[in-house]
A protein has these predicted regions:
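Transmembrane alpha-helical segments of multi-pass small-molecule transport proteins
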Residues: 102, 127-149, 165-170, 328-347, ...
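Loop-to-transmembrane helix boundary motifs in multi-pass membrane proteins
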Residues: 95-98, 133-136, 247, 293, ...
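Hydrophobic transmembrane alpha-helices that form the core helical bundles
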Residues: 76, 98-129, 136-139, 304-323, ...
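Hydrophobic alpha-helical segments and their helix-loop junctions in multi-pass secondary transporters
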Residues: 163-190, 202-221, 376-385, 411-419
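Flexible loop linkers connecting adjacent transmembrane helices
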Residues: 5-11, 44-49, 72-97, 122, ...
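Extracellular/periplasmic helix-exit of transmembrane alpha-helices
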Residues: 66-80, 221-225, 230, 250-279
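Membrane-interface "cap" regions at the ends of multi-pass membrane proteins
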Residues: 1-40, 95-96, 200, 236-240
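Juxtamembrane transmembrane-helix boundary signature
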Residues: 32, 59-91, 100-111
């Protein structure tokens, strides 16, 4: 009987996709989650909470909803075509379209790496008094070695561990503060734009919905040896990928919300402005104790390292895709993309006087590039030439294009407000 059961499980080498086995498909989404609980998010979220209290929590909710839709759509592309977003753009669009967009995506990945490396460096300064410049070099060196010497599976396990540490750290911090939960609940679903908050809103949006994550998700979703032999198998994969995305983005929503809640309950409630993350740690000590401040710094270090890993992977994927290649740690173009992203980010860090403001501006750059990536993605996933029968429906295309338009309008409003 036992042998008969084993034969059934081996038949067609096909995995069972029901029940507890669905947890095997959790993973790619969590790599994306790291990208929007990175140090740039910390800077944006603590600025939002310290300056405007609970009022900008709705931005986290809106951004996360947009993120779920966009990330599932781009993972859809990866599963159906076997191509990442960069490869698909190179294959299916003219060079005059793909090259400028992918070029700006590389710049966005550099901006991302800048924020991630800075976050790790700031955490090292908090914990061990290592200067930011040396901390940046250490973070970049460690991440480069990690990317060049580890398999995807090992990296995925490490990232899941890092996300767990970050989540537990903020859960502990929230137990120490007095949260106005009724006000928080209203703020999660009630849009409010306080005077002077537009830059912070755009920074939060750019910190949650990030262009490099769209490229990354379409790449890492292919890392599993999925069975795609027929339409039923592909549709099951799309369903379970959606569960992975929904769960992972939900984790990210909770952690981002926790940052704003913590800042609102401590800094905003005591009329304390926060100009930099180092200041946030020092201000937490008298309010919540030394242990809470140390846990804050440790979580920031985990966020910095893990998000630098994923931004490096995304840069490698984008750059390799420009040459029609998929990401692989031994591929020359993938390695060049990683080194370009981390190396240029390090050079820029040398000239930054205010690291905290640098984190805010880096998120704004991501938000400005984002519409180009979204329009590219939706154009590809709406094309029957690219996706066949799995192309977006008219309703899905309408929703996705509407998101791109909303982001574009917000960007124009931001640029206008900053210019006048």
């Amino acid at each position: 009987m036992w042998n008969f059961i084993k034969e059934l499980r081996r038949k067609d080498h096909q995995r069972y996709l029901g029940g507890l086995d669905s947890f095997k498909y959790i993973g790619p989404g969590l790599l994306v989650t790291v990208g929007f609980i990175d140090p740039g998010n910390w800077a944006s979220n603590f600025a939002a909470g310290a300056d405007f209290g609970y009022s900008l929590l709705w931005v986290i909710t809106l951004s996360t909803i947009m993120l779920i839709v966009l990330q599932h759509n781009v993972a859809h592309l990866g599963i159906v075509t076997g191509l990442c977003l960069s490869e698909a753009a190179t294959k299916y669009t003219p060079k005059w379209v793909s090259r400028p967009i992918l070029g700006t995506a590389v710049l966005a990945s550099i901006s991302t790496s800048l924020a991630e490396i800075l976050g790790g460096a700031i955490a090292l300064e908090m914990l061990f008094d290592i200067p930011v410049i040396w901390g940046s070099l250490l973070t970049a060196f460690f991440v480069t070695i990690m990317l060049f010497t580890n398999s995807y599976k090992r990296i995925e396990r490490s990232i899941i561990a890092f996300v767990s540490v970050i989540g537990l750290s903020f859960l502990y911090e929230l137990f120490l503060v007095d949260i106005d939960w009724p006000l928080a609940a209203r703020s999660w679903v009630t849009p409010s734009i306080p005077e002077g908050s537009l830059l912070v809103i755009m920074s939060v949006l750019g910190a949650v919905v990030m262009p490099h994550n769209l490229f990354l998700h379409s790449e890492v979703v292919q890392s599993r040896e999925y069975n795609k032999k027929d339409d039923a198998s592909i549709r099951k994969l799309l369903k379970y990928e959606f569960y992975d995305t929904l769960f992972s983005m939900g984790v990210g929503w909770a952690i981002n919300s926790a940052m704003i809640l913590l800042a609102a309950a401590t800094f905003f409630a005591n009329h304390i402005g926060v100009e930099e993350l180092q200041q946030a740690k020092s201000l937490l000590e008298p309010l919540l104790g030394n242990q809470a401040a140390t846990i804050f710094a440790l979580a920031l270090l985990m966020a910095g390292i893990s998000s630098t890993v994923t931004s490096g992977m995304a840069a490698g994927s984008i750059f390799a895709g420009m040459f029609g290649e998929s990401y692989h740690v031994k591929d020359v173009h993938s390695r060049v993309g990683i080194l370009l992203s981390l190396g240029i980010a390090l050079v820029v860090i040398l000239f930054i006087e205010n690291p905290f403001q640098g984190l805010i501006i880096s998120q704004m750059i991501l938000s400005i590039q984002l519409p180009f990536t979204i329009f590219l993605q939706v154009g590809l996933t709406s094309s029957k030439r690219v996706m066949g029968q799995y192309a977006n429906s008219r309703w899905s295309s309408f929703v996705l294009y509407t998101m791109a338009v909303i982001v574009s309008v917000l960007n124009l409003a931001l640029l206008f407000s900053e210019s006048f």
